From Swiss-Prot:
One of its GO terms (cellular component) is extracellular region. This is Procollagen C-endopeptidase enhancer 2. GO terms for molecular function: collagen binding; heparin binding; peptidase activator activity. The lineage of its organism: Eukaryota, Metazoa, Chordata, Craniata, Vertebrata. Residues 297-415 form the NTR domain. Glycans are attached at residue 355.
Length: 415
């Protein structure tokens, strides 16, 4: 049963929206399913707001503010079907007009802080299923200068020579659940970006699966260019960009929260040496990892021994499907969707719902050879950064169902 006290703020907000619209039209605003919105400011709302929104709908609003400005979106009211993972009825907010860089997903009555795009476009999408419904949502968008109170917003474009960024509610309260913030830092072409976290407290997890901060070289979320993924209460070591752009992504799930963080950046001349770290989580110390050498990669590419014989000498053992591969610096970097994990060790495992994956580095890019879309049994070592390390003598073979019984038996083996 929805609380009657929700109607008081709802009515006040509707009255405010009505008053604003009367400056242009004497009629009360009518909220429809999606639309194209341009200008300095305006309101969007679920279809029929403040009435109950219809079932089985998908509505998309595309917002554009003047060039050179960013979009700031403030939810004034939200009442959607509640679910811990927002699987049924939800509102998604995207950077730009495509389903690429999602800033956040929201449901229930949780009202997030201000959401900011990195450019002059933002997309809002609401999806409802066939069952429980609520009164929907109403939000106000406005145009702002890229740096206007930038450290108070959740994300945005940062292009001044120095500045700060912090989690919503910092330092007064814990950051809210269910938020994604994306800060895009852009320096002049001939400069680099140095990044430091002053205070840092994000929900701890061995693999940073729930709440985390990820830092990327460039201007987009791209796992191949990820510098690090961080959680816990130890500030990451200072980071220096490879070029003139960094992207910082903060994500909190819908459960535990923590104090949050504040970080600072400064531009510096490109001529200084850089010390960009390899991808890490705060659970593990920083490492440069193994590098391919002529001597190492001239070894015979041939596995030796058996499944049983290699089990105890391997840090991790898994069966999985290779889903992405990229060659960089003479090594192959692969993402493997895990079918089953038999020995985990310190391997960093990412989890999205029921799907688990791990990132592996084949130090010599073609030895052993991994092909995208194929299933393998993979045994290897784990670097200090949590990535699997596959050497020329690592034990890898095609995964077949008949191997399952033996692997299950090895899982209980005492080494």
């Amino acid at each position: 049963m929805r609380g009657a006290n929700a109607w008081a703020p709802l009515c006040l907000l509707l009255a405010a929206a009505t008053q604003l619209s009367r400056q242009q039209s004497p009629e009360r605003p009518v909220f429809t399913c999606g639309g194209i919105l341009t200008g300095e400011s305006g309101f969007i709302g679920s279809e029929g707001f403040p009435g109950v929104y219809p079932p089985n709908s998908k509505c998309t609003w595309k917002i554009t503010v003047p060039e050179g400005k960013v979009v700031v979106l403030n939810f004034r009211f939200i009442d959607l079907e509640s679910d811990n993972l927002c699987r049924y009825d939800f509102v998604d907010v995207y950077n730009g007009h495509a389903n690429g860089q999602r800033i956040g997903r929201f449901c229930g009555t949780f009202r997030p802080g201000a959401l900011v795009s990195s450019g002059n476009k933002m997309m809002v999408q609401m999806i409802s299923d066939a069952n429980t419904a609520g009164n929907g949502f109403m939000a106000m968008f406005s145009a702002a200068e890229p740096n206007e109170r930038g450290d108070q917003y959740c994300g945005g474009l940062l292009d001044r020579p120095s500045g700060s960024f912090k989690t919503p509610n910092w330092p007064d309260r814990d950051y809210p659940a269910g938020v994604t913030c994306v800060w895009h830092i852009v320096a002049p072409k001939n400069q680099l970006i140095e990044l430091k976290f002053e205070k840092f407290d994000v929900e701890r997890d061995n693999y940073c699966r729930y709440d985390y901060v990820a830092v990327f070289n460039g201007g987009e979320v791209n796992d191949a260019r990820r510098i690090g993924k961080y959680c816990g209460d130890s500030p990451p070591a200072p980071i220096v960009s490879e070029r003139n752009e960094l992207l910082i992504q903060f994500l909190s799930d819908l459960s535990l929260t923590a104090d949050g963080f504040i970080g600072h950046y400064i531009f510096r001349p490109k001529k200084l040496p850089t010390t960009t770290e390899q991808p890490v989580t705060t659970t593990f110390p920083v490492t440069t990892g193994l590098k391919p050498t002529v001597a190492l990669c001239q070894q015979k590419c041939r596995r030796t021994g058996t499944l049983e014989g290699n089990y105890c000498s391997s840090d991790f053992v898994l069966a999985g499907t290779v889903i992405t591969t990229i060659t960089r610096d003479g090594s192959l970097h692969a993402t493997v969707s895990i079918i089953n994990i038999y020995k985990e060790g310190n391997l960093a495992i990412q989890q999205a719902g029921k799907n688990m994956s791990a990132r592996l580095t084949v130090v010599c890019k073609q030895c052993p050879l991994l092909r995208r879309g194929l299933n393998y049994i993979i045994m290897g070592q784990v670097g200090e950064d949590g990535r699997g390390k596959i050497m020329p003598n690592s034990f890898i073979m095609m995964f077949k169902t008949k191997n399952q019984k033996l692997l299950d038996a090895l899982k209980n083996k005492q080494c």
